[in-house]
């Protein structure tokens, strides 16, 4: 009996390719293998009603080998077809006893291996020969009746796995480019109806195919029952398909096989009629309805499983613990031993076909019920009386997870916790209109709810569409083409600012505006301020983001609105008044707070301010500029118009009326002022762009400010003194204006050119003093014209109507002007002191290059008003800011006041004009927002605006002189007043001269200190040079000494090495000499020994010859002698021989002793020579 595998029965030999081990059998092996005892002996049943009494003996080999190296339980090479005995083929047989529950249960692959190796140890009949497993009686019957699968086919497994896909899966893969081989699409058979798909013979060699089933079945029937099985399958799917009839009819007819439940529809296939029923036949789970099988087959199978230690849990069932491939399904309960319990279980399972089985956590899909699952009617039972063989259960289908569209991981009604929106333009093609709030703020944040339906979700999404953003709207994402323009998209779409402007973070459904920091510093050149479309605008002042309007402001707002924001490069340094913000926002650390303001029409505005200018103090400390919410710069072409029609039409009409009144006066004065400014610029050496630079305001309230001031000059000329009475009332307003923080951030008040806000920031005290009242009247008129807030048209009309009567009253009030001059002078002194106090903190904010330019401007302004050459030369050397700015302030204040003195009005006006022109350029140099890097083209936009103050000064001065000439009979009091004024002016000039002298002395001291400092620096530099030279010499000496030491050390080492080499050579020479002496002695010893041996041989030869002669003589003598004499002679002979032997022995011992001593001496000499040699080798 063999207990080993196929390889152990024969002998293996390597094939010709040296890679395959082939087994060769001898005739004895074939005889033992195919002997009649090898067949399975089946004993007849003792009791027909008890199938457990059938017994058979089975001796399986403990290991099974194949050429592929796989271990399989059954080998097709040993199987013989038709295992049913012929005498038991008449009718079906149904066992009536309970199944025997075996104690062996296989749960893992390790259990299977142990069961295979332990199989056959306990066997009832040991006397029989070895019987291979499942040899069939008749080999010549139909080969289609083979019952054993030769192993596991990976191709079939893959084919069944791919058949679980939807019918259009292969087409989708092909369209996506994942399948490029057209052969795969030809034989895929996914779109072929299941009735037409061929069934495979699993017992034979698998044909060549591309797509494979999941599990091949153990038993397959072919032949005439194929159509019946297909018909039964269709009937089982079309019928009730939910109940099992395992009653007496089924028992009487021997319904022992298992039926498979019809395929249930999964939710992912309910809407696809072509994808239905895709796996039940693909898994090759066929119904056993073949009538050719009879009761013999059943009896044989029952006999085989009666005593064979094969648990029915090993066979495929709904509670099977193993698959055909050897894998196990976890969390499976132990199977039921009672058949009726199994039937009840299958009834319970098959009655709920619409329930989805829970997915087992295993490598393979879960196994569904495998026992009878369709209604067996009496008609069908009559047709199908043959027993059914066991088949593999189907695989309960799950929705395919490979090509399943990506679903959102959020819950159904839960918005995302945080959503990052890229700055792109997103158009929502909505089924319902989105919220207005999201579109008005420019930050779309729809509540994203993931869709559970897979119909609206594409399988393959474009890269720009985010799978996690599944919203009720269809998203169309467009990258922004023009980064400088953000147009408000129509309804159903919304726009985001460009990526350079920042980002918006949506938390839940509420938008949070983060601060936008500007990084661009670009400069645009040209007359028009519109930036090029391919360049992002420099974010000096970012446009506001419109918010939702308040309820009270939505009632009558019909003005056109646009979000096209083009930020001009020359914007002033705007500040948002902190008073306009709530207290909670003012102290908050949230960067988003402080951006939301209330507009003039109740609209919430989100301002994006550059840098940290919200909390930064202005240089003047007091002047803040309020910003309008609707900043709209529609600058197209060279027009440079900054206004909105809805709020500026009344003012535009006023400007046109004023402009039409006096065109000639405006033209002449405009030219004169421009020439005076150009002259001042040439004197100061400043670039023309610094003087001509105009502040282009980003406020809709300011329109044609340069021309507006020029057009108002006729009214100022004629009204002159008529407007002077407003001075005292206007000055408190002027002072409060400096300390004011506008509570409504709606209008941006700019003092019109010459009294502009930039000059307020740089020199507030000078702006208060200049012209003492006239310029303030102009400024006040402009404040009235420009207005604050929505009520500005009414105030504008009021001021306009009040101008004409005051023109007529101007001639009758010449005294009021002179009466106020003394109060003005005292007030100017207070302002001078205040300017001194304010000048100290300003000095720290100025920079070196700016102060140098300031010094040049100041010195050249002095030269323009008649300064001495010495003072002019000294002023050119000034580099400090504080004294120069003090003197400039005082000079301007005093010269402005000097205009009131009467006869000197033209000179003082010229001086004041030139001084102010130079100082205007100085203020522009100091202004951080207006640097000289802007070109002349841009600066000439506001040329007329900068030249208008000089026009006003000249016109008002001429007006005063005319009034004085008309009034030739002034009163005594007026003359006294003028004398007093002259005296005061003399005192002021003396004070100014004293201040100049002090400044000159201070400059001289500063120059002396600077000279001393330079001398000290030169001495320090010389000393440092000397120290460096000494240090360099010391380092050179150290390097030289280090090199010398290194050379000496190297020479010493070389000398030592040379001496060591000499010693080594001497030792080697001694060793050589000793060796030669030793060899010589050895040669002498050898020669002596040879001589001695030769002498010894010669002596021995002679002795032999002598012995022979003596023997001959003795023989002769003995023959002659008597007996007694002969005996005596022999005795003496023996004694002589003994004596000679002893002498020879003694002589030999002496020679050996001498040879030993000589050898010892030679050995000692050799050892000494070897010692010298080793010592010589050890030396370096």
UniProtKB/Swiss-Prot annotation:
<feature type="region of interest" description="Disordered">
    <location>
        <begin position="431"/>
        <end position="465"/>
    </location>
</feature>
<feature type="region of interest" description="Disordered">
    <location>
        <begin position="1045"/>
        <end position="1109"/>
    </location>
</feature>
<feature type="region of interest" description="Disordered">
    <location>
        <begin position="229"/>
        <end position="280"/>
    </location>
</feature>
<keyword id="KW-0175">Coiled coil</keyword>
<feature type="coiled-coil region">
    <location>
        <begin position="988"/>
        <end position="1171"/>
    </location>
</feature>
<feature type="compositionally biased region" description="Basic residues">
    <location>
        <begin position="431"/>
        <end position="443"/>
    </location>
</feature>
<feature type="region of interest" description="Disordered">
    <location>
        <begin position="1125"/>
        <end position="1152"/>
    </location>
</feature>
<feature type="compositionally biased region" description="Basic and acidic residues">
    <location>
        <begin position="960"/>
        <end position="986"/>
    </location>
</feature>
<feature type="compositionally biased region" description="Basic and acidic residues">
    <location>
        <begin position="730"/>
        <end position="745"/>
    </location>
</feature>
<feature type="region of interest" description="Disordered">
    <location>
        <begin position="484"/>
        <end position="575"/>
    </location>
</feature>
<feature type="compositionally biased region" description="Basic residues">
    <location>
        <begin position="509"/>
        <end position="518"/>
    </location>
</feature>
<feature type="region of interest" description="Disordered">
    <location>
        <begin position="810"/>
        <end position="986"/>
    </location>
</feature>
<dbReference type="InterPro" id="IPR031440">
    <property type="entry name" value="DUF4670"/>
</dbReference>
<feature type="compositionally biased region" description="Polar residues">
    <location>
        <begin position="486"/>
        <end position="497"/>
    </location>
</feature>
<feature type="region of interest" description="Disordered">
    <location>
        <begin position="730"/>
        <end position="758"/>
    </location>
</feature>
<feature type="compositionally biased region" description="Basic and acidic residues">
    <location>
        <begin position="1045"/>
        <end position="1106"/>
    </location>
</feature>
<feature type="compositionally biased region" description="Basic and acidic residues">
    <location>
        <begin position="846"/>
        <end position="856"/>
    </location>
</feature>
<feature type="compositionally biased region" description="Basic residues">
    <location>
        <begin position="872"/>
        <end position="889"/>
    </location>
</feature>
<feature type="compositionally biased region" description="Acidic residues">
    <location>
        <begin position="269"/>
        <end position="279"/>
    </location>
</feature>
<feature type="compositionally biased region" description="Basic and acidic residues">
    <location>
        <begin position="1127"/>
        <end position="1152"/>
    </location>
</feature>
<feature type="compositionally biased region" description="Polar residues">
    <location>
        <begin position="937"/>
        <end position="959"/>
    </location>
</feature>
<protein>
    <recommendedName>
        <fullName>Uncharacterized protein KIAA2012</fullName>
    </recommendedName>
</protein>
<feature type="compositionally biased region" description="Basic and acidic residues">
    <location>
        <begin position="826"/>
        <end position="837"/>
    </location>
</feature>
<dbReference type="Pfam" id="PF15709">
    <property type="entry name" value="DUF4670"/>
</dbReference>
């Amino acid at each position: 009996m063999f207990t080993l595998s196929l390889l152990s029965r024969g002998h293996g030999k390597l094939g010709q390719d040296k890679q395959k081990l082939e087994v060769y059998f001898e005739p004895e092996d074939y005889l033992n293998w195919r002997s009649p005892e090898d067949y399975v002996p089946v004993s007849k049943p003792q009791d027909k009603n008890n199938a457990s009494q059938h017994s058979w003996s089975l001796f399986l080999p403990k290991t099974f080998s194949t050429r592929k190296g796989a271990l399989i339980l059954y080998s097709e090479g040993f199987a013989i077809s038709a295992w049913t005995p012929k005498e038991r083929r008449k009718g079906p047989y149904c066992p009536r006893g309970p199944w025997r529950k075996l104690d062996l249960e296989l749960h893992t692959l390790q259990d299977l291996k142990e069961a295979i190796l332990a199989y056959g140890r306990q066997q009832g009949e040991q006397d029989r020969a070895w019987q291979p497993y499942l040899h069939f009686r008749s080999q010549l019957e139909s080969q289609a009746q083979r019952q054993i699968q030769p192993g596991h086919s990976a191709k079939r497994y893959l084919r069944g796995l791919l058949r679980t896909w939807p019918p259009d899966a292969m087409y989708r893969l092909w369209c996506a480019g994942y399948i490029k081989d057209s052969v795969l699409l030809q034989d895929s058979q996914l779109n072929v109806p299941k009735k037409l798909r061929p069934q495979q013979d699993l017992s034979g060699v698998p044909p060549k195919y591309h797509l494979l089933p999941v599990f091949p079945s153990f038993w397959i029937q072919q032949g005439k029952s194929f159509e019946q099985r297909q018909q039964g399958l269709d009937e089982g799917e079309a019928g009730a398909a939910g109940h099992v009839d395992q009653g007496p009819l089924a028992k009487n007819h021997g319904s022992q096989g298992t039926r498979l439940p019809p395929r249930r529809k999964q939710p992912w296939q309910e809407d696809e009629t072509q994808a239905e029923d895709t796996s039940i036949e693909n898994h090759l789970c066929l119904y056993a309805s073949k009538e050719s099988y009879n009761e013999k087959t059943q009896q044989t199978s029952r006999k085989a499983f009666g005593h064979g230690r094969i648990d029915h849990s090993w066979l495929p069932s709904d509670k099977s613990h193993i698959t055909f491939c050897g894998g196990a399904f976890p969390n499976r309960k132990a199977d039921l031993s009672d058949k009726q319990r199994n039937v009840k279980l299958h009834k319970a399972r098959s009655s709920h076909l619409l329930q989805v089985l829970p997915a087992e956590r295993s490598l393979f899909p879960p196994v569904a019920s495998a026992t009878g699952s369709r209604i067996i009617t009496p008609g069908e039972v009559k047709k199908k009386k043959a027993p059914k063989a066991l088949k593999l259960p189907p695989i309960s289908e799950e929705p395919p997870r490979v090509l399943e569209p990506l679903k959102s991981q959020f819950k159904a009604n839960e918005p995302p916790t945080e959503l990052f929106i890229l700055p792109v333009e997103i158009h929502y093609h909505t089924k319902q209109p989105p919220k207005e709030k999201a579109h008005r703020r420019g930050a779309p944040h729809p509540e994203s709810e993931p869709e559970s339906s897979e119909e609206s979700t594409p399988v393959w999404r474009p890269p720009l569409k985010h799978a996690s953003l599944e919203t009720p709207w269809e998203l169309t994402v467009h990258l922004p083409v023009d980064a400088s323009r953000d147009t408000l998209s129509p309804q159903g779409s919304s726009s985001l600012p460009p990526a350079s402007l920042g980002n918006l973070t949506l938390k839940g459904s509420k938008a949070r505006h983060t601060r936008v920091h500007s990084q661009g510093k670009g400069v645009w050149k040209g007359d028009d301020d519109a930036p090029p479309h391919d360049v992002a605008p420099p974010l000096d002042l970012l446009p506001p983001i419109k918010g939702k309007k308040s309820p009270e402001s939505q009632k009558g707002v019909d003005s056109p609105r646009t979000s096209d924001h083009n930020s001009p490069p020359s914007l002033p340094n705007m500040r948002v008044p902190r008073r306009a913000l709530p207290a909670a926002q003012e102290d908050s650390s949230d960067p988003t707070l402080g951006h939301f303001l209330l507009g003039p029409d109740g609209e919430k505005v989100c301002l994006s301010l550059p840098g940290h200018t919200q909390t930064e103090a202005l240089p003047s400390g007091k002047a803040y500029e309020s910003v309008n919410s609707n900043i709209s710069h529609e600058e197209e072409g060279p027009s440079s118009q900054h206004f909105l029609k809805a709020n500026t039409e009344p003012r535009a009409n006023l400007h046109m009326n004023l402009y039409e009144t006096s065109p000639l006066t405006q033209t002449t004065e405009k030219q004169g002022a421009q020439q005076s400014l150009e002259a001042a610029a040439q004197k100061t050496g400043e670039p023309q762009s610094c003087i001509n630079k105009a502040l282009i305001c980003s406020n809709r309230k300011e329109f044609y400010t340069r021309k507006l001031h020029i057009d108002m000059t006729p009214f100022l000329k004629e009204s002159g003194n008529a407007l002077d009475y407003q001075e005292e009332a206007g000055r408190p307003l002027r002072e409060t204006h400096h300390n004011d923080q506008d509570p409504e951030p709606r209008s941006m008040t700019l003092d019109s050119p010459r009294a502009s806000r930039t000059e307020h920031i740089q020199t507030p005290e000078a702006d208060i003093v200049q012209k003492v009242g006239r310029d303030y009247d102009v400024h006040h008129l402009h404040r009235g014209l420009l207005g604050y807030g929505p009520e500005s048209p009414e105030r504008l009309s009021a001021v306009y109507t009040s101008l004409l009567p005051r023109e007529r009253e101007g001639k009758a009030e010449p005294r009021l002007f002179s009466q106020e001059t003394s109060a003005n002078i005292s007030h100017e002194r207070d302002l001078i002191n205040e300017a001194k106090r304010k000048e100290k903190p300003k000095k720290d904010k100025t920079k070196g290059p700016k102060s140098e330019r300031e010094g040049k401007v100041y010195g050249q302004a002095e030269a323009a008003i008649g300064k001495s050459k010495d003072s002019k030369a000294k002023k050119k050397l000034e580099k400090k800011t504080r004294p120069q700015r003090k003197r400039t302030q005082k000079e301007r204040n005093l010269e402005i006041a000097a205009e009131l003195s009467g006869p000197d009005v033209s000179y003082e006006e010229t001086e004041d004009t030139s001084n102010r022109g130079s100082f205007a350029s100085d203020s522009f140099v100091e202004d951080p927002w207006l640097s000289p890097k802007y070109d002349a083209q841009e600066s000439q936009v506001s040329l007329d605006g900068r030249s208008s103050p000089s026009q006003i000064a000249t016109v008002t001065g001429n007006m005063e002189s005319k009034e004085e000439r008309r009034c030739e009979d002034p009163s005594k009091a007026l003359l006294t007043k003028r004398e007093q004024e002259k005296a005061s002016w003399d005192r002021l000039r003396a004070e100014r001269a004293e201040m100049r002298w002090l400044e000159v002395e201070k400059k001289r001291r500063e120059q002396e200190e600077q000279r001393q400092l330079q001398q000290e620096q030169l001495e320090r530099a010389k000393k440092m040079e000397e120290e460096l030279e000494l240090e360099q010499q010391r380092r050179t000496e150290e390097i030289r000494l280090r090199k010398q030491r290194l050379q000496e050390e190297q020479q010493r080492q070389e000398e030592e090495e040379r001496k060591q080499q000499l010693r080594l050579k001497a030792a080697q020479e001694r060793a050589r000499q000793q060796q030669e002496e030793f060899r010589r002695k050895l040669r002498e010893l050898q020669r002596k020994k040879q001589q001695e041996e030769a002498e010894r041989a010669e002596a021995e030869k002679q002795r032999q010859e002598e012995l022979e002669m003596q023997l001959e003589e003795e023989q002769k003598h003995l023959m002659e002698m008597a007996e007694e004499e002969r005996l005596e002679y022999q005795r003496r002979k023996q004694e002589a021989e003994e004596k000679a032997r002893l002498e020879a022995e003694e002589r030999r011992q002496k020679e050996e002793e001498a040879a030993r001593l000589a050898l010892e001496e030679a050995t000692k000499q050799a050892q000494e020579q070897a010692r010298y040699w080793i010592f010589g080798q050890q030396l370096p």
